[in-house]
Amino acid sequence: RLTVALNLNNLLLHPFRLSADTFSLGCGIAATLMAGLIYLCVKYSKHRLMPQKEYGSARWGGPEDIAPFLDEDVQNNLPLTASESLSLSPKMKVTANDNYNRNKNVIVFGPSGSGKSYSVAGPQLLQFNSNYVLSDPKGELLQEYGNVLLSQGYKVKVFNLKDRDKSDHYNLFAYIKNEDDILVVTKNLVKNLKEDPTAKSTADPIWEEGMTALLEALIGYVFYELEPEERNMNSVMTLLLMLESQGDGPNSVSQLDLLFDDLSINKPNSFAAKQYKLYKMAPGKTAQSINVSLGLRMSAFNIPSIANICADDTIDLRELGSEKKVALFVVTPDTTTAYNFLAAVMFQQCFQILVDIADHRPDKRLPRHLRFLLDEFPNIGMIPDFQILISTIRSRDIACTLIYQSLNQLKSQYKDDWATIYENCDSMIVLGAGGNPENLEFFSKALGKATIEVMNTSENKGSQGSYTKSYQALGRELMTPEEIRTMPRNWCLLMISGVAPFYSRKYNLKDHPNYHLVEAEGGKPFDYDRRAEQSFADFISDVKDVKTVKLCAENNN
């Protein structure tokens, strides 16, 4: 015992001295085994503890979460809320822990009066950091911001289906290059000329397929066989009226039949002739029904004002993909959807043209960021294959701000493809959700669940009274559906892919650094005379530049 006591005393006096005696070796081995056992218990324990995250780890984002997504140049940001923005830079910071690149597509939900134009479209326009294509129900955005953009050197184009006498002219044939384009335009027209473009047809598919083949033949004939000045939808309507048969018998022929018979003989490989043969495969009575149906759907082109603005092209959509500052307003009436098919065709051709321009540049990107600000997006009809377009435009420096009143509008417009469109928007703003339980539940689940502590108390009032208090971890939605429904009107939700969601104030347009321009220029009727003067000045400048180039070339020679 005395020896053990002396060894222990010596160990305490010199704890770090190495010793080879039995006692020291035994203690070392025991300590090593104990440490190993503890390590193995921790490593292979079946309990995977996540303190404060047992039922969910959702939390609200703060300044530190949005900071990596901001541009040092505030003018190069895309405003989302009063406190959050997103840099338009195509190359954001990439670290070992995260990649801060996000696509610039934004989807916005907000019922009428929630500030979709005031808090989203307006602030994004006033950045003046992009070229813009805007859907503009009623023309309110044109009146508010048209003169403002002019004052900042923008070339402002207007396709006005409401006040057509004030509209630039748009000829869809000006943007057709080949058979591929004919197929795309025809598909769009047939789809959007229906009473409800989003409805699934229950009729025999031969009707729609027959109309498609006939319209492809007519557009193909006009594009390939007529002179450039005759290539427009007015010529298509002229050909369509030639379908009237010269007799009532089963073997009766129309003037159009004779026209395409000659084309088949002279150009047997003609695209138009082949499509016409496909159409003629329909039985006589079926073909007559197809003729009448297509004629009725295309009747808008018989209206003189529509025929006039579609006869030639002054709008030049290709300029949107240039280095110039350009904005296009597509104004549609809010009392009828009869002319929205033209807007749908224009938007689709815009996407195709801009992608093509980008693809032919060395860096495969447009020289200026281009933003589609699509207010009341469902009102412009349905763009076929939009779910593909929105997933491919990012690399060309093109992006969309899609504005809906509700989630149901998106689901109704694109049915089976709505989720693809939603998932290709890395930013979502909820300005309000109305009272639809389905919408409220969707947004609540998108925010996620957090883990909270609930305090339980109990009190015993017997002869020996006692009071106990305990805490229990529970899961709770970051915001319940009811909390989203009763969210104050000046607050909104922002969700950016891969980042904690934000509960923020909506952007107050009056706080924008460029709002003084709206006070000076906004709210007045768009100044078409001022635009004409500006266009003339630009033309003279371009002529001078051309002359300068020619003179330099002559001097060099």
Regions found by a protein language model. Give the residues of each.
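Basic- and hydrophobic-enriched, low-structure N-terminal and domain-boundary segments
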Residues: 1-114, 118-123, 165, 460, ...
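Intrinsically disordered, low-complexity regions
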Residues: 27, 57, 62-63, 248-250, ...
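A broad, low-specificity signal for short, low-complexity segments enriched in glycine/proline
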Residues: 64-72, 82-98, 118-119, 287-293, ...
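A short glycine-/small-residue-rich loop at the edge of a beta-strand within enzyme catalytic domains
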Residues: 72-76, 341, 377, 434
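P-loop NTPase motor domains
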Residues: 102-398, 413-414, 423, 482-506, ...
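Conserved ATP-driven motor cores of ASCE-family P-loop NTPases powering translocation/secretion/packaging/pilus
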Residues: 390-493
